[in-house]
């Protein structure tokens, strides 16, 4: 039996006396595309930071590929293949586009420069960018192009991680603040990138088009707990009061504005 890509059991997270997650259970299967939704401040991005190994839960257990995660990613000798795409592209401004996309290969592999260049070019083309921008600096690109460069970077395999391990791709509010056309381009890239990497993905978003275009399964987080989980089709039809309120954007319902 194949182990889940990620498994959270009774996960808690506190900031001082304030609970952010209050006993969250979640299982992510290989190849699955999950979208975590909920109002601002509900703890969605905290889930991503835990999965990425940037923080450890203050309670409960977290496993990636069946291995308990008890150390931060930077403290692990053999960390799992988890790739985080930030809302801000988070590119290194002093490095070229090619060096940003191939950063892991330049730093950790023994591949020849020509091989690295070929892999970077393939990643750039996969996200609809010309290989001719490889020598440009990120600051010379538009915001949309920078975001696509960050997606290309997510397609690069970490040479220190076994190729048999399926990657987990994490996307933090990838379409926040974008116009509808730009949203569509990024949403298509999320699906394509996940498929090309042959991995699973977790998207945090409150943008309805992103839910529609990227989700196979949806979970709704509010006040530190998952209040609903189901397929995208079930999300459309659910009469769960949290889902109904989130879909409609109504002020009436169990989720109260100004609480988070």
For each predicted feature, which ranges?
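Helix-to-loop junction immediately C-terminal to a conserved catalytic motif
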Residues: 52
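Conserved ABC ATPase signature
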Residues: 137-141, 145
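Helical segment within the ABC ATPase nucleotide-binding domain
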Residues: 184-196
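A short, surface-exposed alpha-helical micro-motif characterized by mixed small hydrophobic
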Residues: 211-213
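H-loop/switch region of ABC-family ATPase nucleotide-binding domains
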Residues: 205-206
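ABC ATPase NBD coupling module
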Residues: 69-83, 107, 235-238
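Conserved ABC ATPase "signature" region
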Residues: 114-132
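Catalytic Walker B motif of ABC-type/P-loop ATPase nucleotide-binding domains
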Residues: 164, 169-172
């Amino acid at each position: 039996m194949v182990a889940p890509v990620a498994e959270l059991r009774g996960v808690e997270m506190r900031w001082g006396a304030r609970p952010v997650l209050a006993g969250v259970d979640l299982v992510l299967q290989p190849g699955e595309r999950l979208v975590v939704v909920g109002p601002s401040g509900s703890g969605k991005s905290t889930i991503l930071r835990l999965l990425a190994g940037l923080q450890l839960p203050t309670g409960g257990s977290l496993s990636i590929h069946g291995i308990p995660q008890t150390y931060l990613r930077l403290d692990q000798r053999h960390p799992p293949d988890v790739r985080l795409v930030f809302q801000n592209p988070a590119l290194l401004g002093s490095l070229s586009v090619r060096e940003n996309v191939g950063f892991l290969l330049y730093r950790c592999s023994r591949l020849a420069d020509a091989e690295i260049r070929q892999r970077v070019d393939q990643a750039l083309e996969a996200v609809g960018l010309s290989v001719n921008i490889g020598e440009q600096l990120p600051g010379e690109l538009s915001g949309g192009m920078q975001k696509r460069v960050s997606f290309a970077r997510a397609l690069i395999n970490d040479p220190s991680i076994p190729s048999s391990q399926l990657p987990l791709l994490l996307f933090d509010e990838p379409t926040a603040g974008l116009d509808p056309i730009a949203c569509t381009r990024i949403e298509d890239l999320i699906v394509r990138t996940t498929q090309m990497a042959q991995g699973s993905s977790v998207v945090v978003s409150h943008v309805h088009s992103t839910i529609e275009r990227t989700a196979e399964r949806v979970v709704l987080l509010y006040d530190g707990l998952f209040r609903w989980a189901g397929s995208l089709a079930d999300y459309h039809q659910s009469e769960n009061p949290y889902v109904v309120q989130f879909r409609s954007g109504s002020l009436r319902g169990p989720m109260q504005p100004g609480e988070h």
